[in-house]
């Protein structure tokens, strides 16, 4: 099995595999140390007005505020073309099929839509998946200090931005959770977050496991 990870995030009109549509897909490949390889790919897929008007209010508002809805209307890219674009990028860095796991946050939902709409992409990926949200849930139970100290999450709700956040989140857990017991102090956690956010001087932190994250 190769060391690369294929990070994918999808935006849909909803979460129901029956009627809902895949309208944006982005992909980034990283090496085993989570260094991004290449520029990645981000594709907005056309959907008709009937599909867009069927979105529930919270999803419609989210995609309207992010600008995705208008981009979907204007897009001329169909599903097959989008799949080919994603595979072309992944193929630049992952040469053999079924060798690179799919990675992301709550990635099973994304993979369900990929399996439905992009079977060649689904078949190219290894069956194993690395779900950052699983690590988050374990830290909440085993290392609450790490969980409550995690970097704030943005609210872009766009595929490529969400992938960058997921990679940064796994970098955070790698540097704070995947260390010998009892794990890092709150001050060490704060320093990791500051480094990942590009902040020179980390603020002082109280060594508490109860302070909730800001995002």
UniProtKB/Swiss-Prot annotation:
**Gene Ontology MF annotations:** 3'-5'-RNA exonuclease activity; nucleic acid binding
Which EC number applies?
3.1.15.-
- Entry's InterPro entries? Exonuclease_RNaseT/DNA_pol3, Oligoribonuclease, RNaseH-like_sf, RNaseH_sf
Which GO cellular component term is one of those annotated?
cytoplasm
Pfam families, per the entry: RNase_T
Q: Does the keyword rRNA-binding apply?
A: no
- Keyword set for this entry? Cytoplasm, Exonuclease, Hydrolase, Nuclease
What residues form the catalytic site here? 127
- SUPFAM superfamilies assigned to the protein according to its UniProt record, in alphabetical order: Ribonuclease H-like (SSF53098)
- The Exonuclease domain is annotated at 5-170
Q: What is its main location?
A: cytoplasm
* Intracellular or extracellular location(s): Cytoplasm
Look at the named UniProt entry and state the broad enzyme category this protein falls under: hydrolase
Biological role stated in the UniProt entry: 3'-to-5' exoribonuclease specific for small oligoribonucleotides.
Family, per entry: Belongs to the oligoribonuclease family.
Which HAMAP family does the entry link to? Oligoribonuclease (MF_00045)
The protein's name: Oligoribonuclease
Taxonomic source organism: Mycobacterium ulcerans (strain Agy99)
Q: What is the lineage of its organism?
A: Bacteria, Bacillati, Actinomycetota, Actinomycetes, Mycobacteriales
């Amino acid at each position: 099995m190769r060391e690369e990870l294929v990070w994918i995030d999808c935006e849909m009109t909803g979460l129901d595999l029956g009627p809902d549509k895949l309208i944006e897909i982005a992909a980034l490949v990283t090496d085993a140390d989570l260094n991004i390889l290449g520029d990645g790919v981000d594709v907005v897929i056309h959907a008709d007005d009937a599909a867009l008007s069927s979105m529930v209010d919270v999803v419609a508002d989210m995609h309207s505020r992010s600008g995705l809805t208008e981009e979907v209307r204007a897009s001329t890219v169909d599903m097959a073309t989008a799949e080919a674009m994603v595979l072309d990028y992944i193929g630049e860095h992952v040469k053999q099929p079924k060798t690179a796991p799919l990675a992301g946050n709550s990635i099973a939902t994304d993979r369900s839509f990929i399996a439905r709409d992009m079977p060649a992409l689904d078949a190219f990926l290894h069956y194993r998946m690395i779900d950052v949200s699983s690590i988050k849930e374990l830290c909440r139970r085993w290392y609450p200090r790490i969980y409550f100290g995690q970097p704030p999450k943005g609210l872009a709700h766009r595929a490529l931005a969400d992938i960058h956040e997921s990679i940064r989140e796994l970098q955070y857990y790698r540097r704070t959770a995947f260390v010998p017991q009892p794990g890092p102090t709150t001050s060490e956690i704060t320093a990791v977050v500051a480094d990942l956010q590009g902040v020179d001087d980390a603020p002082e932190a109280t060594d508490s496991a109860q302070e909730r994250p800001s995002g």
